[in-house]
Amino acid sequence: MLSKRSLRVLKWGRCEAAYAAAYPKVPDWVLNFSPLPSLSSPHRDFSAFPAAQSEHMQQKMSENGAIPRQGKVLTVDTMNANVKKVDYAVRGPIVQRAVQIEKELKEGVKKPFDEVIKANIGDAHAMGQRPITFFRQVMALCTYPQLLDDNKFPEDAKNRARRILQSCGGNSIGAYTTSQGIDCVRQDVAKYIERRDGGIPSDPDNIYLTTGASDGIVTILKLLTAGEGLTRTGVMISIPQYPLYSASIAELGAVQINYYLNEEKCWSLDISELQRSLQAARKHCNPRVLCIINPGNPTGQVQSRQCIEDVIQFAAKENLFLMADEVYQDNVYAKGCEFHSFKKVLFEMGPEYSKKVELASFHSTSKCYMGECGFRGGYMEVINMDADVKAQLTKLVSVRLCPPAPGQALMDLVVNPPQPGEPSHQTFMQERTAVLSALAEKAKLTEQILNTVPGISCNPVQGAMYSFPRITLPERAISEAKAKGQAPDMFYCMKLLEETGICLVPGSGFGQREGTYHFRMTILPPTDKLKLMLNKLKDFHQRFTQQYS
């Protein structure tokens, strides 16, 4: 153990070395100087040096990093460069302006509308959807167990709450859980997957409960991101895409590889386009990941079984890790469309694929009929993951301790809802059916009304909870937008917000083919408000077109 004086001498030696680097010949007054300046203070005492030498020495040492420059430690210039590349259009400038307008309305500022209609995000409860009764009953019981003695709650809700609480430390949902998630919840998730996929086995040890699906997606991308230059990981994402993917890829320093969905064929996925995209990317990175969103966000398409088989074959042939974002798996509306999980199709294709293709699939409490976005519940299942990598995954999630316990509890209710014969089953089924039926009607309504507007073309909303119509913009509008440094559809959507109070997300925030323009809107508002919004949008588009023609 060095004495304090020895440490001071050692530190001063480093300062002397910094000075020597700046001045080849060290003056005698430096070498013979005594006593030593105080080095325990962040501000070195150079008062004993002649003024010129003191100023010069501090400047040189600051340049060499021995003394920090004055001012902020963290600035835009010194922050993580990857963070500056992150963009998330769903909560971008238009949404920020919508929040300002809401404040202005509350302050009495006159607008040509009375409210802001936020159709920019898939937040069902914010749009007025009522929570599922059974879910909220159990969550109330879990968060305030004294209610277990209240006869207002049905017995199946009480039994479910007791089971969850017994799996929590101290019988409290406020306790930390195991990092991979509450054991009984992971077991229920595995059973749900087996039922969904026709009996194909699911191992609870392959289930990781997550803070929404987003957390799981980012975690898997972290594992996959590696290399530099030509070896840097490339991640294939659909265009249009959900901005979580492009934002995460930018933050992690991976390479975004775009493949385009076919708008003329209801946003279908063509294997030839995947091949084109892959071959082009291999010239500048190492493509390792293929991301699929099914049903689609923002485009609302539902992939056929044949398409999924083709994608799996492509991934196997090109040695790609598959990520299947399946958070809208209950949101299928169009006749002839059906949700097929990637895992089910993978295993039904036989051991040639089921033993080889690496797959991570994701689900959430935020979408489908539940709409419980704020609880941040979700899970991921990993298939064919290398055992050593899986150990690293478990380590990685352990760093964050655990997902929110209430979100885990809600995920349990989603995968294990009231069963036939239980007191809450009938009400649960009525509420679930009502939500999904209303969404199906609104999907059709949105398509029908938008397609009556000259200059707007909307593909069928087969699933999920968004439409992504194409808009034709006059050249004058495009020129004015570019003069303002805005994407033309951003210009359009900002005008729409200011004149009507309707908040949409421009297609440029999701990616689109050059020369095309779109916007994404959710179908979640109540039917009467959705009709009002669509008609206001129709009138605005006609005015906008006339104004700039």
UniProtKB/Swiss-Prot annotation:
State its cofactor.
Answer: pyridoxal 5'-phosphate
Q: Which UniProt keywords apply?
A: Aminotransferase, Pyridoxal phosphate, Transferase
The reactions it catalyses are:
L-alanine + 2-oxoglutarate = pyruvate + L-glutamate
In terms of Gene3D superfamilies, this protein maps to: 1.10.287.1970, Aspartate Aminotransferase, domain 1, Type I PLP-dependent aspartate aminotransferase-like (Major domain)
Question: Which molecular function terms from Gene Ontology are attached?
Answer: L-alanine:2-oxoglutarate aminotransferase activity; pyridoxal phosphate binding
User: Biological process (GO) annotations?
Assistant: 2-oxoglutarate metabolic process; biosynthetic process; L-alanine catabolic process; L-alanine metabolic process
Q: What is its EC number?
A: 2.6.1.2
Would the keyword Acyltransferase turn up in this protein's UniProt record? no
Pathway annotation from the record: Amino-acid degradation; L-alanine degradation via transaminase pathway; pyruvate from L-alanine: step 1/1
Annotated positions of the N6-(pyridoxal phosphate)lysine modification: K367
Entry-linked SUPFAM superfamilies: PLP-dependent transferases
In its keyword annotation, does this UniProt entry include Transmembrane helix? Answer: no
Q: Which Pfam families match?
A: Aminotran_1_2 (PF00155)
Biological function: Catalyzes the reversible transamination between alanine and 2-oxoglutarate to form pyruvate and glutamate.
Q: Which family does it belong to?
A: Belongs to the class-I pyridoxal-phosphate-dependent aminotransferase family. Alanine aminotransferase subfamily.
Assembly mode: Homodimer.
What is the recorded name of this protein? Alanine aminotransferase 2-like
The taxonomy runs:
Eukaryota, Metazoa, Chordata, Craniata, Vertebrata
In the UniProt record, what gene is named as encoding this protein?
gpt2l
